[in-house]
Swiss-Prot record:
Belongs to the GrpE family. It comes from the Bacteria. This is Protein GrpE. The keyword Cell membrane does not apply.
């Protein structure tokens, strides 16, 4: 009987343990499935975070590049503004220079009565031109040079045996540049070249 009672108690122990094992396996499978879902969720969140981080880095790099471009443009604009700040002032000085040139042209340097005036105007004009050159204003006097539409304004064309075609034969009014930028074009008469053209038969 003791053997039977041992068998009975062993059967009872096995019956009691077996449901626990089955319950444990089911709960483990359940936990494993939940863990797998959680891993997938975390991997998806990680991928989204990495994508967002890459996008933010890209936006940050673009913003830094744009900031650098703005700084470069601003520095260039400041340099241009400083370089050409005198443009209006220089334009106002050009008629004064023109008037001094006309005074020189209208005065005879050989005549004793006007010689002193001529020399005074000439010295004043040289000093004036030297002063404006220090600020980047230079004369455009294209006498005898090829016609350049960027710096010259043609008033007309005339035939000339002395000057080849498209050459400035007369400067009516000198032009001026401010730091290599045109302030006023030179008013010029352009040569058409010789009056006759040889034609071969």
């Amino acid at each position: 009987m003791s053997n039977e009672s041992n068998n009975t108690s062993q059967d009872q122990v096995e019956e009691a343990v077996t449901p626990e094992i089955v319950v444990d396996e089911a709960s483990l499978m359940d936990e494993l499935t939940q863990a797998n879902f959680r891993i997938e969720e975390l991997e998806q969140l990680l991928a989204e975070s990495e994508t967002a981080l890459a996008e933010r880095k890209d936006v940050e790099m673009r913003a830094a590049a744009e900031t650098q471009n703005i700084r470069t443009r601003a520095a260039k604009d400041v340099e241009q503004a400083r370089k050409f700040a005198l443009e209006k002032f220089a334009n106002e000085l050009l008629p004064v220079i023109d008037n001094m040139e006309r005074a020189l042209q209208g005065t005879n340097p050989e005549d004793e009565a006007t010689k002193a005036i001529y020399e005074g105007v000439e010295l004043t004009m040289k000093g004036f031109l030297t002063s404006v050159e220090k600020f980047g204003v230079t004369q455009v006097n294209p006498q005898g040079q090829a016609f350049n539409p960027e710096h010259h304004q043609a008033i007309g064309m005339q035939p000339s045996a002395e000057y080849p075609a498209n050459t400035v034969m007369m400067v009516m009014q000198k032009g001026y540049l401010l730091n290599d930028r045109l302030l006023r074009p030179a008013m010029v008469m352009v040569s058409q070249g010789g009056g006759s053209v040889d034609v071969e038969a």
